[in-house]
Amino acid sequence: MTDHEKEILDKIKQSTEKTPVPESLAPDQIMKMLEEHNSTQASGHIPKKHGFSRGHRMRGGLIAAALVLVVGIGAHIRQQNLSSDSATSSTKGSSSIGTSSGKLASSDTLETATDYDEVYTYLQSYQDELDSSSVTGSTDSGIVMYSTETADSGARTDSSSSSSDSSTASARAVDTSFSDTNVRTEGVGEADIVKTDGSYLYTLKANSQEISIVDIRSDQMKVVSGISLNENFQASEFYLSDQKLFVLGNMQNTQVDSDSKTLYRGSCTRIQTYDLADINNPKSIGTVDQSGCYRTSRFKDGYLYVFSDYYIYDTITKKDYPSYVPLVGDNLLKQSDIYLPTNHAADQYLVVSSVSASSPDKAADQKAVMSENGEVYVSENNIYIYEYANSSILADNLAAKNQTILRKLSYNKGKLSGSAQGKVKGYLNDSFSIDEYDNTLRLVTTVTHNVGSSSQSNSVYVLDADLKTIGKIEDLAKNEQVYSARFLGDTGYFVTYEQTDPLFSVDFSDPENPKILGKLKIPGFSEYLHFYSDNLLLGIGMDTDENGITNGVKISMFDISDPSDVKEVSKYALDQYYYSDVFSDYRAALVDPEKNLIGFPLSGSANQYVILSYDKDQGFQVQMQEEVNGNSYLGTRGVYANEKFYVINGNAIEAYRMGDYVKIDDLLL
């Protein structure tokens, strides 16, 4: 725990000495969770289904929980110095909103707010419902849980890049052969903690406040320059494109006042852009802030699309618009840019902005979707925001809770526009379980059948462009749950698990009548699927025996040439390793079929990085398995450039010669 965190907790403890609070929100408990999280970061282990999208986000959630506690007992919170004059309310009064608890809206129309008063009513309704249901402490310190994956996935992708694409500049490359970030959707760039252009490595240091630029044109690596961020700016990841670096993360403005009585609160997502034309002297050329904690982003056709979670923790006042309306730049979002929730209340927004790479000092467009907690999947043309209603305090029956709500926004050259909303039964494991193809949306969900019971099954749904269900298969793999999925053209594959690993193949050629083609049962389960060719599907997961006891990380190759008769043609178990970052972040995988290279980090008694190759006769062959130096919670990445392979963790970089993988250099930043 940092001195700054201790200082904040001390102030909270002083403020709460005479005020009873839930045990889970007690300062001592928050301190305990922080220390436990530090230990978790050191081990590198994130439990399945309950991981956080970033280590520093969990810490942010804990501090946010502490801040919520202060607000709850009446601490004085100063808002940003914004004039409500910038908000122009409609002359209409507040809309009439239904107040019957437990019912999700049946409307299939994605509606925008008519005025800020309407937005206020939805937010206040949530708080009223929260108060009346007496569940103020039910979220265990107010930490927001995220899906275990930290980016997205689904269409066939390659990790390698033989030429510059939307998120990688190649102008300086002495060899155009270098790897790129493993992405969810081909053609849609994603940020990461390490990038290369073939000549330089760009890496986020362990403190999340510096980016080092390392010359890799010779065997001996050399730091040529770096970027030091504002001390209150915690970077999460960045993009590299056309000699510009786009850094994304959270700007923290929390501090204890000198009078020891006032706690200042403020946090926003920041997009800061640097010009790399002079590689020895990067220059800041633009900054855009938006309300909320950074969630994720995408890059396509010269535009960044940035997503943040904006939670309404504080007491709000109807006419004090800056207290509850999101900001992008210095401007409050217009009412027409705020999409209303599907039920009668909400406690947060998912804020979406677009920023042009050529004008990085301002937002091109912005929207906000009111919700209770949503995840994001981005296809080539649309953004899908999905949230599982089971967590809702507003749904009091299983039918209302056990469904996923979907909202659809189109995007094109920076322009954002809401287009549809819908719902399906059950919940999505991650964004690999949702895929857009040929104007349809395919989903694989797990459905709970009884309140308080483990009884569940799995379903396949096909939705049209308006998010209306046009095809489905239900009651699959009873008492199991989806662990991974992948789609290729008219065929989908998904893995469920209880003690064995059934790999289902689904025919979507007739969207109104999807059909199960085959089911292969093998021990263990695959957490991540990646197409290795048109006929081969790679799986990375865990090896288990018939009793469900894990034996280590397993890699499998499936022959999918006949989707009705899928076969596991090769497998390799890496025993003594209980986890891989790939399970929660697909960007940790480097899969390049052209180079016959499969690389990913391992966690066990020691942290290692493994590279395997695949041959149809010999199966998997380990080409390299080396211990990883560095202990950054940001994770480990492997990249290649100019026939050299680099393993990066925090401030440590190790270089290997590809082919024999002999170590040729290392560098401590």
Please provide the spans of the model-predicted regions.
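Membrane-interface helical sensory segment of bacterial ECF anti-sigma factor regulators
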Residues: 1-6, 10, 35-99
